[in-house]
């Protein structure tokens, strides 16, 4: 209900938090191309009372890391930092939560400076709708703000919008999703992310998780 959203925890999860391990598909696995990828993502609700249009102000932070644990010294070869701040509006139908809309200002960076710096900012508009308790559709579009001569082609990799859907089993123990990220250009060049998760117990919030990207 709306009261539950208003009184919910100030600190919680945002995107999926996961650890995965594996090599790229189509190449022979080696210690150089087999790594751990993990993501940590949190959200901090900054307002208890509702703002105009029934929104709440949130602070977001997501960090993604590629960790070559099979190499000597186990280097972390690619780090991605993604802080943001924005408004979130929960959506209700007959006092039942059915989704949300969001407006965010985000920064994304590899945390380096000089010629190795890869960073950009964006204003993003997102939303998710629960079509029924087992099926959710979602999407996000962003206006990029790119600085630096080394970042001009970043939209060819990070894209300009994304959409997808997620399906849950009736008992909530199995879930699968697909996300399509449209890269820059007029052709049908999409990054595809497939995910599947199996919940060991309905009393647990831990999942066996697999991702193809």
Segment roles from a protein language model:
Residues 2-5:
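Short, small-residue-biased leader/transition segments that mark boundaries at the very start
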Residues 34-40, 55, 77-83, 99, ...:
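Residues that define the transmembrane beta-barrel architecture of outer-membrane proteins
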Residues 40-44, 83-89, 105, 125-131, ...:
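Residues on the lipid-exposed face of transmembrane beta-strands in outer-membrane beta-barrel proteins
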Residues 64-72, 90-92, 104-114, 142-150, ...:
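Sequence/structural signature of outer-membrane beta-barrel proteins
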Residues 109-183:
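Detector for outer-membrane/organellar transmembrane beta-barrel domains
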Residues 159-213:
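Accessory, usually C-terminal, subdomains that scaffold auxiliary metal cofactors
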């Amino acid at each position: 209900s709306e009261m539950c959203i208003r009184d919910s925890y100030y600190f919680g999860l945002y995107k999926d938090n996961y650890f995965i391990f594996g090599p790229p598909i189509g190449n022979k696995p080696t210690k150089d191309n087999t790594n751990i990828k993990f993501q940590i993502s949190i959200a901090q609700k900054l307002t208890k009372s509702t703002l105009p249009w029934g929104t709440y102000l949130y602070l977001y932070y997501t960090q993604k890391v590629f960790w070559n644990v099979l190499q000597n010294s186990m280097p972390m070869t690619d780090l991605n930092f993604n802080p943001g701040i924005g408004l979130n509006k929960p959506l209700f139908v007959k006092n039942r939560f059915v989704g949300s809309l969001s407006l965010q200002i985000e920064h994304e960076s590899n945390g380096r400076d000089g010629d190795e710096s890869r960073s950009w900012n964006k204003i993003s508009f997102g939303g998710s709708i629960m079509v029924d308790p087992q099926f959710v559709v979602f999407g996000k579009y962003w206006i990029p703000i790119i600085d630096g001569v080394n970042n001009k082609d970043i939209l060819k990799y990070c894209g300009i919008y994304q959409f997808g859907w997620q399906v849950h089993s009736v008992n909530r123990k199995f879930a699968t999703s697909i996300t399509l990220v449209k890269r820059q250009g007029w052709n049908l060049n999409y990054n595809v992310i497939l995910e599947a998760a199996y919940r060991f117990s309905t009393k647990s919030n831990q999942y066996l998780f697999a991702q193809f990207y």
